[in-house]
Every structure is written in C-alpha cells, then in structure tokens.
Design a protein with these regions (language model features):
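Hydrophobic alpha-helical topogenic segments used for membrane insertion/localization
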Residues: 350-372
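N-terminal active-site segment of His-dependent metallophosphoesterases
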Residues: 1-78, 82-83
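Active-site-proximal beta-strand elements of phosphoester/diester hydrolases
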Residues: 9-19, 150-160, 201, 286-292
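Extended active-site neighborhood of metal-dependent phosphoesterases/phosphodiesterases
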Residues: 1-4, 65-194, 258, 307-309
C-alpha cells in the first residue's frame, strides 16, 4: 500500500499505550472511534503496549480463569488485538504498529503476534527482515502523484521479552541503529543527496530525554519524584506536562549520533510514560512525548491521542494532543464513564458507588418512614 500526500498535507494520528485486553474498556474505544471519525487521519501509528500482553490470562469478575496454555493465550491475544484494530479496519485507515514492553510478555513470539496484525488489509509495515525485528521498519510517504518519496516514517523496536530468562530488555538494538543509518543513506541518495525529512517513532524514550528535565525543590508545583527521592520538572524551554519521572531505555547504542549524522529526523516520538505529554529539543532534534490512551492502567488528565500534520512542500510538521474530554466533550455522562473505566480513578469510583448506595438507602428509608406514618 503506497501512502501519498493529499493536497500537500498528510495527517498521522498516534495512539500510544492502548494497553487493553480481550475485555476492552469501552470508554477508550469510544474515545478512539470518535478521534478516528473527527480527525480523519491518513495513517494511524500504534506506538507500543498495544495490548497488555502479560495479563492475557486475566478474566472478568465472576468468570473462571480460562487461559491455561499457548493456544488459549493466543486466542485471547487475537481477540484483544481485534478489539483494537477492527474499528480502524472498518474505516479503511492505514495503520502501522510497533511493540512496547508489555506486548510480548507471554508465550508468543513477536512474529507470531505480528501475524494477527498482518491479517488486516489496512496494515502497513511489519516487514523488518533487514533490520532484525519485524517491528523495525520504515514507511515512505510519496508525493500526490506517487513519483517521489517526500517524507519518511521510522518505526523502531525498543523492548523484547526473553522467554527463557523471563526478562525484559529495553533499548534499541545496535543492529537496528546500523539498519537505520544504511536505509537513511539509501533514501538520501535516491533523493539527490538530500536527506528525506522523517519522524521516528519508538515506544520507550531515549536516555537523552533526561536532558529535558532538571532537579527542583519538592515544593515546586510541577515537581515529580525521581530516583533517590529527588524531584524534577521540565526545563523552562520545554512545552507540556511532566506527570512522572522519565522512564528511558536502559542503555545508549549510538542512536542519537546516527540521527545527527543522517540529518533526516525532524522529531523522535515516544510513548511508555503514561502521564507525560511534552515536547523539547535535544541537540537540534525535537523530542516528543505522548501520553497513554488506555483506561486499563494508570494515567492522568492528558490521556488521549497525538496528531502530526505534515506539510509536503517544506517537510515540516505541526503536532498537538487531544485529551479524552477534547474528543468526546465535557458532560456528566462522559465524566462518569471516565471515572468508571480508568484504573487511576478507583478511589473516586468507590466514593461514587458508596455515595449512590447511601443515597438509595436514604431514599428507601424515607419511603419506608412515609409508609409507616
């Protein structure tokens, strides 16, 4: 499938950390479906932790545990992925995906899981045979007449689960960096010696992201707790919200040097940190952090999606985020749905249930007293 600019524009919708199961949280899907309809993206990128792969054996309340082996776990995985992808497929929107640190923490390999995504006609990519990982690949975006690559999307894997060691590794593999350098050079050569402007998506933030935060006093209104009981906030030149300390990859493998050498990266875009939503610049490259979409995990008021609008003529982009309330609107019903489905709203949910129960008891007592009188 060839992606093309339309009237000089191309819109990407990023959904990060959808992180759900076969029993999907309906509030997230309602938010995403409305975002798809309202924003009309040319491409949807799912940037990791698309499913909660290490909890596929979880069950609904009052139902027995039904995932006991690989075939049943694979079935649960297929249902979870279908709940996320079917709305995209129904709208015939091209989509691309990468894995996060939760997707393959189960009995399935990444390639086995990729087969579920590949069965959808709107899937782009997952063909990283040269890069070493199925979810490390690039997506060219062509001019409207299809004769020239005008922009490029890089998708890089940052986490994988070693089944034998039962251990998760979190960094960009050195061979992936080499693949990026080689492929970027080929695209540059095809473009008359000029780097093809690009966005790079990966799940876990680069270690260089830590250069965008600074230590501060615990009393600072923007402070978040970090290692060694120290507190941090975004540097003044950054824009957005720091809701938690940056959880970056475990090691550097030459990625930053490769990006600067290649000269094609307009921005590198991350997910993973559910409560962070900010942008900043490191060594001339834009760093973009996108919050989670999931309700089956911790999060905050930033929960939503991110949009990238790319201009064909300049190769530049504009980006913005939309929160749950931006997308579905502000109303009592939408607020109740949010409280009911979001894992970080458990205390409010309990208070809501208790308050409702107390109100019903009071009404019942009043009716009973009225009958007695």
């Amino acid at each position: 499938m060839q992606l093309k600019f339309k009237n000089g524009k191309f819109r990407i919708l990023q959904v990060s950390d959808a992180q759900d199961l076969q029993h999907v949280r309906h509030t997230m899907m309602r938010m995403l479906n409305k975002a798809y309809d309202d924003l009309k993206p040319d491409l949807i990128v799912l940037t990791g932790d698309n499913i909660l792969g290490n909890h596929l054996n979880d069950c609904e309340l009052w139902t027995p545990l039904f995932v006991k082996d690989k075939p049943s776990e694979m079935k649960a995985m297929g249902v979870a992925i279908d709940k996320l992808i079917s709305p995209i497929e129904e709208r015939k929107i091209p989509f691309a995906m990468i894995y996060g640190n939760h997707d393959d923490r189960n009995r399935m390999t990444k390639d086995e899981q990729a087969d579920f995504y590949r069965q959808y006609s709107c899937n782009i990519g997952l063909d990283g045979t040269d890069s070493g990982d199925c979810d490390t690949y690039n997506i060219p975006i062509y001019s409207e007449n299809g004769d020239k690559i005008k922009f490029n999307i890089w998708m890089l894997d940052t986490a994988w689960h070693d089944k034998e060691k039962d251990e998760c590794f979190e960094y960009v593999k050195p061979e992936a960096v080499e693949w990026y350098k080689d492929t970027s050079a080929k695209l540059k050569a095809q473009n008359g010696g000029v780097p093809v402007p690009s966005l790079m998506f990966q799940h876990i933030p680069m270690l260089e992201t830590l250069e965008l935060i600074e230590e501060c006093d615990s009393a600072d209104k923007d402070a978040v707790r970090g290692p060694d009981n120290k507190y941090f906030k975004l540097k003044p030149e950054c824009q957005g919200h720091l809701g938690e300390y940056v959880s970056a990859v475990s090691q550097k493998t030459g990625q930053m040097e490769a990006m600067k050498e290649s000269g094609d990266i307009k921005a590198v875009v991350f997910g993973h940190d559910h409560q962070n939503c900010f942008t900043g610049v490191v060594d001339g490259i834009n760093f973009v952090q996108t919050p989670c979409a999931s309700f089956r995990c911790y999060g905050n008021f930033c929960r939503g999606v991110r949009v990238f609008d790319i201009d064909e003529a300049t190769g530049d982009y504009e980006t913005f985020t939309l929160t749950y309330n931006d997308i579905v609107g502000k109303s009592l019903w939408n607020d109740l749905c949010y409280i009911w489905d979001a894992d970080d709203m458990v205390k409010k949910k309990i208070a809501l249930i208790a308050g409702t129960a107390g109100g019903l008891l009071a009404i019942g007592a009043g009716v009973t007293l009225g009958l007695l009188l």
